[in-house]
UniProtKB/Swiss-Prot annotation:
GO cellular component terms given for this protein: cytosol
Taxonomic source organism: Shigella dysenteriae serotype 1 (strain Sd197)
Annotated catalytic residues: C146 (nucleophile)
Catalytic activity from the UniProt record: dUMP + (6R)-5,10-methylene-5,6,7,8-tetrahydrofolate = 7,8-dihydrofolate + dTMP
InterPro entries named among the record's database cross-references: Thymidate_synth/dCMP_Mease, Thymidate_synth/dCMP_Mease_dom, Thymidate_synth/dCMP_Mease_sf, Thymidylate_synthase, Thymidylate_synthase_AS
Annotated family: Belongs to the thymidylate synthase family. Bacterial-type ThyA subfamily.
Annotated positions binding (6R)-5,10-methylene-5,6,7,8-tetrahydrofolate: H51, D169, A263
Function: Catalyzes the reductive methylation of 2'-deoxyuridine-5'-monophosphate (dUMP) to 2'-deoxythymidine-5'-monophosphate (dTMP) while utilizing 5,10-methylenetetrahydrofolate (mTHF) as the methyl donor and reductant in the reaction, yielding dihydrofolate (DHF) as a by-product. This enzymatic reaction provides an intracellular de novo source of dTMP, an essential precursor for DNA biosynthesis.
Pathway assignment: Pyrimidine metabolism; dTTP biosynthesis
Quaternary structure note: Homodimer.
EC numbers: 2.1.1.45
Full protein name: Thymidylate synthase
Length: 264
């Protein structure tokens, strides 16, 4: 995960001080790209411990089309608590847009099923895309999508994915985002009988919050360790049938976790 540490250092060296929606303040750069060859290991940050349970359950929750935090709470995941209303609802966030994007004529488009069908039947298409950025529903969402748009690409029997993330909390959020989409690529590849290729991450407003500086310097002082390996124990009938128990991370030996406040 050298690329991730290099990004942190770049934001420290080149970032512009900016105000933000949360009132916390950031150092920010605009436009950055990282590429992870998923054949070389699972891109889970090793310079601090990442909470893999939260990453897996959040992705399964997205794939369910769920937008209420009850499922997350049932599995001891609290990463969405700050944005939920008193009933646990978040409005039409990621899961809704991925699985039931509303059309003007009253239909709903299941984008995940659509891209799976494209990967199986038209893998050379340049339109294998999922968008969470539904302009017509942004004002109903508890939080506008940060990781907003992703595209799949098949070449030489390998599945790659590029994500555009319009806003990126480099210290807290980005390790989750990288691991989550890498996991999704592995799942999609298994469902389509493909090998994994690259995960390409592209960031817009890429920032470190002002109250994450000490934590960032601590993380940069640590030496990265070898990447772990992802093992998927079974192949379900559908992308929507995976369970938490289907995934195992082998050889994950991270440095200790680093606590930091969430900007809300």
């Amino acid at each position: 995960m050298k690329q991730y540490l290099e990004l942190m250092q770049k934001v420290l060296d080149e970032g512009t001080q900016k105000n933000d929606r949360t009132g916390t303040g950031t150092l920010s750069i605009f436009g950055h790209q990282m590429r992870f060859n998923l054949q070389e290991g699972f891109p889970l940050v090793t310079t601090k411990r990442c909470h893999l349970r939260s990453i897996i359950h959040e992705l399964l929750w997205f794939l369910q089309g769920n937008t209420n935090i009850a499922y997350l709470h049932e599995n001891n995941v609290t990463i969405w608590d700050e944005w939920a209303d008193e009933n646990g609802d978040l409005g039409p966030v990621y899961g809704k847009q991925w699985r039931a994007w509303p059309t003007p004529d009253g239909r709903h488009i299941d984008q995940i099923t659509t891209v799976l069908n494209q990967l199986k039947n038209d893998p050379d298409s340049r339109r294998i895309i999922v968008s969470a950025w539904n302009v017509g529903e942004l004002d109903k969402m508890a939080l506008a999508p940060c990781h907003a748009f992703f595209q799949f690409y098949v070449a030489d029997g390998k599945l790659s994915c590029q994500l555009y993330q319009r806003s990126c909390d480099v210290f807290l959020g980005l390790p989750f985002n990288i691991a989550s989409y890498a996991l999704l690529v592995h799942m999609m590849a298994q469902q389509c009988d493909l090998e994994v290729g690259d995960f390409v991450w592209t960031g817009g407003d890429t920032h470190l919050y002002s109250n994450h500086m000490d934590q960032t310097h601590l993380q940069l002082s640590r030496e990265p360790r070898p990447l772990p390996k992802l093992i998927i124990k079974r192949k379900p009938e559908s992308i929507f049938d995976y369970r938490f128990e289907d995934f195992e991370i082998e050889g994950y030996d991270p440095h200790p976790g680093i606590k930091a406040p969430v900007a809300i």
